[in-house]
């Protein structure tokens, strides 16, 4: 599946000044097989954007185009605009939500007060999967998100915050969407929990899912993604290579997105193939990355 957002505008309160938009002429594309980071501070528009991609919200202006192949392998196109009538909305909303999944930051609100197995089975059955087959899917998916079979018989109130997020991911995976958005999946997790969560996302990506990770933490995305979409005040102010942002010291400082752990950050860059020397400050690190990017540009 491919998603094209074209000049999306969202205004929650029409009485507010016109410049106070939750989304302001947002235009971007999400292609099949990408692992993208959506970066921005709290209130920048990240979550509102995600809610539009999943049809939880509809744009006040602009349109969202979905390109996908149906069960007969025929290419389909679905264009979403603000509908005039509710009946028109029903024609596309189920198809979008079947193909575009969302795991929100507060995952416990996506879980029912029943066993984890029933939670996961519900997602599969809602997409037309027979119940017996859905039970087998639940057993496979629970291990995919790093939990053993014993968790299937537990209830949500028995789980930690990180475990609840994994179960929420399992419920979405049971619906087998093409694209999955994760809204602040590492928020509130300890370093070990953060690493495990990112490893789960990377595993899903390698299995062919399109993954979009929304976060305000620059450190947690550099090892895993190469493209990022940077939101500020409801607008996209950058959409491109993650590391190219680091070539602009002023941009990072103005948007308060400097890496918090310089040593850890340097090690991540080396791990993915950037030969960074022993730098002593963020400014030195940025300067060295700038030279590497320039060298790669000249080579091309």
From Swiss-Prot:
One of its GO terms (cellular component) is ATP-binding cassette (ABC) transporter complex. ATP binds at residues 40-47. It is a peripheral membrane protein. Its main location: membrane. It comes from the Bacteria. It is found in: Cell membrane. SUPFAM superfamilies: P-loop containing nucleoside triphosphate hydrolases (SSF52540). It is an enzyme of class 7 (translocase). Residues 3-258 form the ABC transporter domain. GO terms for molecular function: ATP binding; ATP hydrolysis activity; ATPase-coupled transmembrane transporter activity. Belongs to the ABC transporter superfamily. Energy-coupling factor EcfA family. ATP-binding (A) component of a common energy-coupling factor (ECF) ABC-transporter complex. Unlike classic ABC transporters this ECF transporter provides the energy necessary to transport a number of different substrates. Forms a stable energy-coupling factor (ECF) transporter complex composed of 2 membrane-embedded substrate-binding proteins (S component), 2 ATP-binding proteins (A component) and 2 transmembrane proteins (T component). PANTHER family: ENERGY-COUPLING FACTOR TRANSPORTER ATP-BINDING PROTEIN ECFA2, HEAVY METAL TRANSPORTER. This is Energy-coupling factor transporter ATP-binding protein EcfA2. The lineage of its organism: Bacteria, Bacillati, Mycoplasmatota, Mycoplasmoidales, Metamycoplasmataceae. The gene is ecfA2.
């Amino acid at each position: 599946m491919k998603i094209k957002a074209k000049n999306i505008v969202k205004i929650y309160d029409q009485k507010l000044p016109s410049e106070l938009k939750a989304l302001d002429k947002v235009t971007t594309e999400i292609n099949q097989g990408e692992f993208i980071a959506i970066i921005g501070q709290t209130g920048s528009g990240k979550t509102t954007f995600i809610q539009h991609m999943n049809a939880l919200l509809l744009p006040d202006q602009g349109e969202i185009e979905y390109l996908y192949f149906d069960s007969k392998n025929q290419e389909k196109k679905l264009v979403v605009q603000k509908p005039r009538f509710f009946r028109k909305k029903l024609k596309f909303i189920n198809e979008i939500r079947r193909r575009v999944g969302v795991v929100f930051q507060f995952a416990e609100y996506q879980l029912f007060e029943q066993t984890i197995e029933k939670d996961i089975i519900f997602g599969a059955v809602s997409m037309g999967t027979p119940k017996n087959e859905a039970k087998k899917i639940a057993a496979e998916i629970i291990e995919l998100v790093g939990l053993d079979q014993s968790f299937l018989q537990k209830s949500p109130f028995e789980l930690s915050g990180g475990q609840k997020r994994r179960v929420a991911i399992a419920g979405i995976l049971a619906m087998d969407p093409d694209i999955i958005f994760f809204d602040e999946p590492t928020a509130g997790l300890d370093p070990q929990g953060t690493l495990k969560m990112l490893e789960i996302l990377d595993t899903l990506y390698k299995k062919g899912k399109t993954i979009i990770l929304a976060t305000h933490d620059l450190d947690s995305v550099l090892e895993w993604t190469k493209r990022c979409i940077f939101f500020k005040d409801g607008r996209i102010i950058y959409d491109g290579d993650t590391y190219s942002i680091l070539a602009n010291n002023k941009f990072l400082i103005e948007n308060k997105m400097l890496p918090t752990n310089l040593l850890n950050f340097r090690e991540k860059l080396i791990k993915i193939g950037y030969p960074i020397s022993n730098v002593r400050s963020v400014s030195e690190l940025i300067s060295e990355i700038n030279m590497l990017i320039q060298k790669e540009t000249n080579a091309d």
